[in-house]
Structure formats: structure tokens, C-alpha cells
Amino acid sequence: PEAVKYKSWSHQERLCDLKEKVSLHKKGDIYYISQFTRSKTGTSFSEIKQSEELASFFAERACEFLHRFIVGGYEGWCIVTTPRRRHNEGFHFSTSICTKIAGAVKIPFYENAIQCLTKDRLNPEFFLLRPIKEKKIIVYDDILTTGSTLLATYELLKDREQLLFLVGINNK
């Protein structure tokens, strides 16, 4: 999709030009891969997170990446998304992306499998709502800001054979 060309009206509104820029990053003990990055012009994050069309676009790009990255097939893999905020109801961007990825590569998607015990965004504590039997897990986060969500998810799942952290937009 073509990015909307306008500058942010406020300092708070973040934008993405939707030009793919796959990058590897390190945060604490983990490495994560981002598909896109924040930009000075483009579509606002809030608009992106409300768009089913852009969820399909992000999922297609993620599948293309996964086909190149996961060698030997998807047997034993599943996908989860980082916990959704409790006050958000209705369309959920990450859930839509993960549903599309899971269908395309034929792996289980554990929707709402991880929940946050605290409201603290900088030091969240997560727990599993249900068991995840697969030992290889793709953890998807739509927009990374501080990285604390990925680190908390890592602490919860670090006993697994493989963890692949995939981020839609790196907001750093």
C-alpha cells in the first residue's frame, strides 16, 4: 500500500512510511527482527493498527520473511502475539496478523495465550493462560517501543527450543 504523505500533527503521533526495512536488533539477552521502522512521514501508527488491509500487508511481508528464514519447514512451530491491552476491544492488529500468518504457513496460533499480571508497561510480568505444546515459537509484536514486552515474553518462554521474535514496526 501507498503510505499517506503528511507530517505528524503532534510530537506524540508516530509514523511509518511502510517501506520494508528488515533489521536485526539486540535488547538485553534477546535478538529480534523488525520488518519496518518509524519514519518522519507516512501513515500514523494509530491508523495502521486499525486497518485490516494493512494487517494483511504486514502478514504477507512476514510470511515472505519466514519462508526465507525458517529452513526445513514449520513442523513443531507455532505463533503467539504479545499480550493485548486489557482496555482494547474489537479489531486487534497483532491478532489479525498472527491469524493470517498461521493460516498461510499452517502452524497453530495461540490467541490470548499470554496475559500480563501488572499494568506496569516498563516491567510487565506475564503468565501463560494455557499450555503451548510446541517447542519452537514465533513471538509477534506489532509495534516495539521500549522492548520490555519482548523481554518479559522471553522470560516466560526461555525454556523453549527456539524463539523467534518478530516485530512489525521498530519504534526506536
Regions found by a protein language model. Give the residues of each.
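Active-site-facing substrate-recognition patch
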Residues: P1-E75, Y110-K136, T146, N171
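Short glycine-rich phosphate-binding loop at a beta-alpha junction
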Residues: Y74-R86
